[in-house]
């Protein structure tokens, strides 16, 4: 199937989800815009300056269709305010029947890189999570197009709810997270020219989302580092610290 047909199929699925959802009550819509001092993806410094990342999603009974983009605001890798990446995703998430403590997700992502020389690519993913102490989770991504390799992320997190509140629907939380990821030789060879599987990157993050009804404002900071020596040598900026603020609205 050609890339254009895949893109049309993904867009059709997202729109179909939205059309179906509008006729039902079990529906969620969301829009968001994040502003960060860098764009770091899986430990890779993609844009080393301020970016804006708008997104939109529609959900229906566990299914979610979403569109996410990255805008280079200062012309680091493309012209000012142009998009250098647009992602289209379909996700299904739920709990395991009879085991409400454990959840799972599965989906598809189409990565497009407008205004760049990079070819688009596609991934399937699947994940498991547990509603236990530190919320352990694992997520496997398989790039079956350009990289033909896997990226497996192990994560933990903790949320301190309502560290401050100003009424029933006005409060703020403290959200902490950490992850480490392993990538196979195919993935590392494509992205770094390293023909070995390795633990690639580790990330820690902290955020303080302020919730005002359906509106959330979330300042956050994060730090990531490349772990494997060969991968570190292949990346220009192996250690990254960044921060920013996200705005989201659900209805």
Predicted regions and their residues:
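Cleavable N-terminal export/targeting peptides
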Residues: 1-28
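Short loop/turn motifs that connect adjacent beta-strands in outer-membrane beta-barrel proteins
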Residues: 22-28, 95-103, 116-118, 133-135, ...
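Short glycine/proline- and aromatic-enriched beta-strand/turn motifs that initiate or cap beta-hairpins
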Residues: 23-74, 90, 181
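Residues that define the transmembrane beta-barrel architecture of outer-membrane proteins
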Residues: 25-27, 48-52, 82-86, 102, ...
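Residues on the lipid-exposed face of transmembrane beta-strands in outer-membrane beta-barrel proteins
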Residues: 33-35, 54-60, 88-94, 108, ...
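Transmembrane beta-strand segments that form the barrel wall of outer-membrane beta-barrel proteins
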Residues: 33-39, 63-73, 102-114, 124, ...
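Outer-membrane beta-barrel translocator domains and adjoining extracellular loop/strand segments
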Residues: 43-47, 76-83, 116-122, 139-140, ...
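Detector for outer-membrane/organellar transmembrane beta-barrel domains
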Residues: 121-195, 223
């Amino acid at each position: 199937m050609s890339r254009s047909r895949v893109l049309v199929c993904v867009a059709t699925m997202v729109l179909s989800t939205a059309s179906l959802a509008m006729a039902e009550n079990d529906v969620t819509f969301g829009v968001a815009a994040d502003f960060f001092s860098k764009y770091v993806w899986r430990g890779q410094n993609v844009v080393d300056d301020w970016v804006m990342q708008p997104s939109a999603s529609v959900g229906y009974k566990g299914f979610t269709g979403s569109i996410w983009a990255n805008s280079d605001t200062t012309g680091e890798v493309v012209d000012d305010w142009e998009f250098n990446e647009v992602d289209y995703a379909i996700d299904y998430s739920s709990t395991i029947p009879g085991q409400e403590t454990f959840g799972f997700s599965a989906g598809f992502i189409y990565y497009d890189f407008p205004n760049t020389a990079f070819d688009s690519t596609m991934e399937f993913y699947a994940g498991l999570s547990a509603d236990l102490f530190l919320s352990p989770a694992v997520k496997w991504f398989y790039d079956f197009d350009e990289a033909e390799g896997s990226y497996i992320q192990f994560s933990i997190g903790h949320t301190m709810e309502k560290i401050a509140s100003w009424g029933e629907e006005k409060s703020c939380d403290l959200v902490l997270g950490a992850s480490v990821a392993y990538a196979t030789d195919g993935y590392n060879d494509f992205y770094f020219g390293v023909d070995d599987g390795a633990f690639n990157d580790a990330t820690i993050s902290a955020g303080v989302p302020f919730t005002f009804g359906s509106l959330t404002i979330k300042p956050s900071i994060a730090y990531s580092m490349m772990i494997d020596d060969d991968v570190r040598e292949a990346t220009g900026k192996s250690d990254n610290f960044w921060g920013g603020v996200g705005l989201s609205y659900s209805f």
